[in-house]
């Protein structure tokens, strides 16, 4: 039996306080307004009989005489095959004009997957982006962010990864998006040809903060059902996790919580970890691979959001000057696939290329300071130009095997075989034959 409460004692921001009994944290409530409209709210805290709820869609138009009905369940999202190809908002309602989604309601904010049923990641996710495939491999079930400054093309990178991987289903969770960003996701998914296997959960910048917080939970709840029930390999793309953290901060401030670092709530680490830990490779089942975008205000890597994220995830891609910076990027799972599911020369070649490129940066610094350059410095600078053009540029779109072959060609065009520090048996097998004795 549902109990109706009519005594709203306080309205502040997107929060209301009502005198009620028996409410649970996270419980969903329906607010019936005196004008006949209704909206939903979620329980954030309670103190004796005073229950504080966050109202979806804001409190504009609410009055203290509105009726509050506690539904006895937490927030749910519709799950089913009809979800594929659809776009929904932060409360799970369609926004694409295609009518209602049909399926079974499933709870969000569920616990992470049972560790006993997880398996060690073993498969590579190929993206056709050399700076990922060659140097920091993306592994199935990996959780990894893209650290990006404002103005970088991180959304374009996300869409390219979505289009070029072999994931069965792509789920995009957009948080704090402008209309331009939202339109870009819709148009690019159609242009790149994966709209028919894509689900989008969209929170726009003008929507309520609580809807922003729900976006990752909805996306990951659906991803887990697809992976468990249908053995699907699901790629989840979340952008922007800084907007997610800002929504948490706004809610915490409204609730008069004591802030921690730079105003963010003290629970920021656990709030982020709860979402990232949903990435999983399921024994005899599907998988969830999670890539997020975390923008760094002021290009500050020590900002609380990227700083906490780095302790949770299995590496990061550092997007800088519209390139994936090899020195700021890391994949902690790449050793599980390099040389095991890729070519035998992969590891040695990648290490040699990065080492020589690091040396070229030192040579470029010496040149900028007016030092006389040695012949070796000149070789390094010539190598760096080829490396940046043929491998580092995000415009390069080639399979892993071709990228490895290009890496060998770049080395052969710039150095003698004995100068690159690669094992002789690999030199004899992969060094371009026309340059074998250089």
Curated annotation (Swiss-Prot):
It comes from Chlamydia caviae (strain ATCC VR-813 / DSM 19441 / 03DC25 / GPIC) (Chlamydophila caviae). One of its GO terms (molecular function) is proton-transporting ATP synthase activity, rotational mechanism. This is V-type ATP synthase beta chain. GO terms for biological process: proton motive force-driven plasma membrane ATP synthesis. Pfam families: ATP-synt_ab (PF00006), ATP-synt_ab_N (PF02874), ATP-synt_VA_C (PF22919). The keyword Endoplasmic reticulum does not apply. Produces ATP from ADP in the presence of a proton gradient across the membrane. The V-type beta chain is a regulatory subunit. Keywords: ATP synthesis, Hydrogen ion transport, Ion transport, Transport. Belongs to the ATPase alpha/beta chains family.
């Amino acid at each position: 039996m549902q109990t109706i409460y009519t005594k709203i004692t306080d309205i502040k921001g997107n929060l209301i306080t009502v005198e009620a009994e028996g409410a649970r944290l996270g419980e969903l409530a329906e607010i019936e307004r005196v004008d006949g409209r209704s909206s939903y709210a979620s329980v954030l805290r309670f103190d004796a009989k005073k229950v504080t709820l966050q109202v979806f869609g804001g409190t504009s138009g609410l009055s203290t005489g509105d009726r509050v009905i506690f539904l006895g369940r937490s927030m749910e999202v519709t799950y089913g095959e009809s979800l594929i190809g659809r776009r929904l908002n932060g409360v799970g309602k369609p926004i694409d004009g295609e009518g209602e989604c049909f399926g079974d309601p499933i709870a969000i904010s569920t616990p992470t997957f049972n560790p006993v049923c997880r398996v060690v990641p073993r498969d590579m996710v190929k993206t056709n982006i050399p700076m990922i495939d060659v140097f920091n491999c993306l592994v199935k079930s990996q959780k990894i962010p893209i650290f990006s400054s404002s103005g970088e093309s991180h959304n374009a990178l996300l869409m390219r990864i979505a289009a070029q991987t072999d994931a069965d289903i792509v789920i995009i969770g957009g948080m704090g998006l402008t209309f331009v960003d939202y339109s870009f996701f819709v148009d690019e998914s159609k242009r790149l040809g994966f709209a028919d296997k894509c689900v989008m959960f969209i929170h726009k910048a003008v929507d309520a903060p609580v809807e922003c917080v729900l976006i990752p939970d909805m996306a990951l709840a659906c991803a887990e059902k697809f992976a468990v029930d249908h053995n699907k390999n699901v790629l989840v793309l979340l952008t922007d996790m800084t907007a997610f953290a800002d929504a948490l901060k706004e809610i915490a401030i409204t609730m008069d919580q004591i802030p921690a670092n730079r105003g963010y709530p003290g629970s920021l680490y656990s709030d982020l970890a709860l979402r990232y830990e949903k990435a999983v490779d399921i024994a005899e089942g599907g998988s969830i691979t999670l890539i997020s975008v975390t923008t760094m205000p002021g290009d500050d890597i020590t900002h609380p959001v990227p700083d906490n994220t780095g302790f949770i995830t299995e590496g990061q891609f550092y997007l800088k000057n519209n390139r994936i910076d090899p020195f700021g990027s890391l994949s902690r799972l790449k050793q599980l696939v390099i040389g095991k599911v890729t070519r035998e020369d992969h590891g040695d070649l990648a290490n040699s290329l990065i080492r020589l490129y690091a040396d070229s940066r030192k040579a470029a610094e010496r040149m900028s300071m007016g030092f006389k350059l040695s012949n070796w410095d000149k070789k390094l600078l010539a190598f760096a130009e080829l490396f940046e053009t043929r491998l580092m540029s995000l415009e390069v779109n080639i399979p892993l095997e071709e990228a490895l072959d290009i890496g060998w060609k770049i080395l052969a065009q710039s150095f003698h075989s004995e100068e690159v520090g690669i094992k002789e048996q690999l030199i004899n097998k992969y060094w371009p034959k026309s340059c074998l004795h250089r």
